Amino acid sequence: MGTYLKNYSDDEFSVAGEKPEVEFMDYQNDDTLQDYASEDGPVIVTVPFPFEDGKPKSVLVGETSTDTISIENTSSESVTLWSVRIFSSNPENSYVLSMMRPPLNDANEEAKQDFLGLTSVEDRSLLPGHTLTIWLSCMPKDIGLHTSIVHVDIGDEKIERVAFLLADDNISKALLSEEPYSRRRGQNKKFEPAPIVPGCRPTRQHAQGFKYKLPQFAIPAHIRELIESKQRPDVLSEELSMINYAQFFSTLLVMEELNLEEEMRAYDMEGVSMRRRGRNFLSLEVPGLAERRPSLVQGDFIVARYARNDSRPYQGFIHKVEADEIFLQFDNQFHLNHHDRNQYHVSFTYNRVNMRRLYKSIHEAEFLGPDILFPCQSPCRALKRWPFKPLNPHINTEQADAVAMILGCRGVPPYVIYGPPGTGKTMTIIEAILQLYTAKKKAHILICAASNTAADHVLEKLLLASYLIRPSDIFRLNAQSRQYEDVNSDFIRFCFFEDRVFKCPPLQALLQYKIVISTYMSSSLLLAEGIRRGHFTHIFLDEAGQASEPEAMVPLSGLCGRNTVVVLAGDPMQLGPVVYSKQAEKDGLGISYLQRLLFDFEPYETGNPNYVTKLVRNYRCHPAILELPSELFYGGELIACKEDEASPAYDCIGLPNKSFPVLFVGIQGCDEREGTNPSWFNRIEVSKVVSIIRNLTKGGTVSEADIGVITPYRQQVAKIKKALEAFEMPDLKVGSVEQFQGQEREVIIISTVRSTVKHNEFDKFFNLGFLSNYKRFNVAITRAKSLLVIVGNPHIITKDRHWDRLLRYCADNGSYQGCPLPPPESYSYSDETKYDEDQGGPAGWDYNQEATSYNCNQEATSYNCNQEPSDSGYRGDNDAKSAATNNRTKWSEELPEDENQPFNNAEADPEEEMPKQRVKEGAEQGDVQPNDQCSTNDDQVHDAYPAKYTFPPGWCDISGIPASGWD
């Protein structure tokens, strides 16, 4: 019950350290703070406010919470109690000692006035067998963790007790969960391979017959065995080259696919029942489905077996998804034999079509040659700037240079537009497309984007110049899996569909379009329909930094000819490819094609204008918002062109420094999970975020649509949305960093969630959240135009060098509010995340450019980029993340908690194409049977059951690598 420390002063043994100040005690990371060993001594001191289920007791702001400290003399002699006192409290003076019970919250004023609080109890004699009871009370004035350290000096002993309370308000209290977290276990049962009895697919899944079928690319058995045994294929130790290109990326894709299989197996269920729904359907309840754990949509299928024996597996297609239920259609005999009392073992699957497209793209990439894959091996080129008259009068010098170079390009190598946040990448692409369309009558242009949202955004911008483009020349290609209702009504006329189901038009119709807009994956439908290599004179890859190299090769490998001009636009310092296998990400799948070009090949690395243009003028952010990311990631080169003007939002939240609209609100909350949902939330931060939003929108000063909330965890998104429902704020967007990439808001509020070192180290090890991922950090803090507010625990934030820089940046400019700041020297940066200290993009960028004139605000101004590059930026994010080996197994059991784990994208906005949707996009097309009966397509059945994967002849034929090449 207590710990004795003899003849020590307070500061020599206190958990508060040398000063009587409570900075931050991480009770979630240190189980000993309230876990006192039994004492051999004569005096026993109880612990006030003991934890409840491992967490501090909750108390409402403004209400008094009390508990006792009992000091019992178990010896046969009297002992002298020198003092009992509060050594330290956080917030300061938030706790009170007393010899009398504090008045209840509903007590009258007289009782409250009669209460006598003490700073200490001194000089008392405690008789043998007697117990002294002292009251410790706290009435919180604000939400968050309240901590107190009490010292008991008795005889020649000193005993310390630490008290914790978590202060809630009505908002955070309403988000309390009564269901403790317990990890849901999936089935681990192994079944002998058996032919799957096919089910009946939904009507909308019957696709057109494509001219060219997609090969299966089944995973070779020996490669599966090698990777599943945790052995590293030799090819991954080789330097990437034309010779091993297909083998190298095929291996990485196999690693990725095996990871996807494993993740889906975690959701398998044993001994479950189904209910008959009407004549044709059986329904299955899937726990976590509402949170998309797993994420299932119409057209997916499950595999079911009777639980009573090792029976044949049956394929059941999903025809409808409702809350936690899926409606399934199996083989007719399965429905006839079904009884509601039957029990089944269920396995979830994912559709392999997009993975097969990726395999195909890298195997065919060899036809592109070194000009695309390894530009350093191609002859140097000298482009002639093509003279043109800007159609958009607002494009700047660098944007005009990029357009002139693109117009002057004659085929490969690719041209790169390196565009940091808010510098107008899309504007540059749109200008180039319009110039090509109007000046080059034979131009056929393909524009690919990383998501449906991004592709629609390109279409939207093109339509602003509709007076220049004939509507019949534009086509927006959609995957069949995309819901008709998700498409903006203004865009429907540019799409091709039948019965509200999107399709790819016939070849002759495709050939007539001058501008085709697609996602990376859907572009494969063009090849499947018969479009040949070289048809497109120009291929634009927008947001190329978000696409893995195999994804970038989907449009390039089959459609890019020798004379095709390829243009990549993106920023390698922002979000990279979505990769689920951490080993595959580390070995190269996490490096985008754009990043490889910029960092590995001298013409791009040195900023040669014949190969690359870097945009440096930011029109989005207030200069104070832009300054830190510019210094950290872009060598201080970015130029803020947004006018520095005060926003009415500044007064709404009491911004301390009106000329510095970056505010850090420090708060000590609590990391929590509930039920079987492994995603994290912090209800204290939710309340603070909602409070800030209410202040901003009070009186209509700031509209809901002008505010965005970024937070890394799905459950935090859900909790914030739930809290906002009470205040009727449907237009306010809350989402992950990925959902805000390419977007902006006048006001951005960031909720970091993490309040314990232990969970932050977990994120750091697996590169989750955004407290350990500098690319997510960069995107998060560059979405705001006028005001950026960060809500988080400063003691956790400071463990990462980037977030610590942001914290100190705010504090140094007098823009910090909340709990006490940690001193600058209190934490060293973790060595567990190793960063490359090369700064500001490609190492060869010349930051000492000569002064140039440019019209930022419609007036002639000048700027000078003669700034030294910072030494704290990074060239890549694929360095190995090391951590304590003994934590690896424990942590890996918790992996599905992250916002970006596969198939777990709950709360995503309907229009957003999240990672799972990337895997699924168009998954029903290119290899299905165009009939209306139950599918007997062996390819589909083959895909449904991983154990049937074989090594068919021709697996590597397309790349010229024989089967033995995998050894």
Regions picked out by a protein language model, each given a short descriptive name:
Residues A439-K442, S451, M521-S524, G530-Q849, ...:
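Conserved helicase motor core of SF1/SF2 NTP-dependent helicases
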